[in-house]
């Protein structure tokens, strides 16, 4: 029997009898299973209408989860230049607040402003703005990347001693 994520998914749907057929037809990953439709279920051999309905509903839920998670990713691309100059003063607020929170929106991000619609679409940040946002978040959370456990200092004396003995150690090999 196949023991993978698709088997576990089908077992959760109480349809583990189709696991082998899924894998045999190339549906061995949930990413691939998100593309399943009626013709695919015919090829897999899912003939019972109740089973087909359960699988198609689960596929729909997988797609919804994937769409909801899409807002969590970002890319480092320059923002397109607006066609007309938009000058709008947005007071600096706390970054990283979820949509609909009581805090004011982030600078230049109209999604975080009060009254703005809460959307989960992909947002691109300029590289410099993203660096500033990350730096501010680290400072706010009290994280110092130059201190343990995030970094480990190598003693300089050890490096100098190694370099001074380097010609000797290379002759031994």
From Swiss-Prot:
Tissue: Detected in kidney glomeruli, and in peribiliary gland (PBG) cells at the hepatic hilum (at protein level). Detected in liver, kidney and small intestine.
Keywords recorded for this protein, A-Z: Cytoplasm
Keyword Cytoplasm: yes
Pfam families: SAM_1 (PF00536)
Highest taxon in the source lineage: Eukaryota
Localization per record: Cytoplasm
Effect of residue 28 to A: Strongly reduced binding affinity for EPHA5 SAM domain
Induction cue: Strongly induced in EPCAM-positive liver cells in response to liver damage caused by long-term 3,5-diethoxycarbonyl-1,4-dihydro-collidine (DDC) feeding.
Positions of the SAM domain: 1-65
Disordered: annotated span: 89-120
An annotated GO cellular component: cytoplasm
UniProt main location, coarse: cytoplasm
Assembly with partners or alone: Interacts promiscuously (via SAM domain) with EPHA5, EPHA6, EPHA7, EPHA8, EPHB1, EPHB2, EPHB3 and EPHB4 (via SAM domain) (in vitro).
PANTHER family linked: SAM-DOMAIN, SH3 AND NUCLEAR LOCALIZATION SIGNALS PROTEIN RELATED, STERILE ALPHA MOTIF DOMAIN-CONTAINING PROTEIN 5
Designated name of the protein: Sterile alpha motif domain-containing protein 5
Organism: Mus musculus
Organism lineage string: Eukaryota, Metazoa, Chordata, Craniata, Vertebrata
């Amino acid at each position: 029997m196949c023991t993978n994520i698709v088997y576990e998914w089908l077992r959760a749907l109480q349809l583990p009898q189709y696991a082998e057929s899924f894998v045999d037809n190339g549906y061995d990953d949930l990413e691939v299973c998100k593309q399943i439709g009626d013709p695919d279920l015919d090829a897999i051999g899912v003939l019972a209408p109740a089973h087909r309905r359960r699988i198609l509903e689960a596929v729909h839920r997988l797609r919804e989860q994937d769409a909801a998670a899409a807002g969590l990713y970002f890319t480092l691309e320059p923002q397109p230049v607006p066609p007309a100059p938009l000058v709008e003063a947005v007071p600096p607020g706390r970054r990283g607040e979820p949509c609909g929170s009581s805090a004011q929106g982030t600078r230049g991000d109209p999604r975080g402003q009060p009254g703005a619609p809460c959307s989960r679409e992909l947002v691109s940040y300029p590289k410099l703005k993203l660096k500033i946002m990350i730096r501010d978040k680290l400072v706010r959370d009290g994280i110092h990347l130059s201190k343990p456990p995030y970094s480990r200092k190598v003693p300089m004396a050890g490096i100098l001693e190694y370099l001074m003995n380097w010609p000797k150690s290379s002759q031994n090999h």
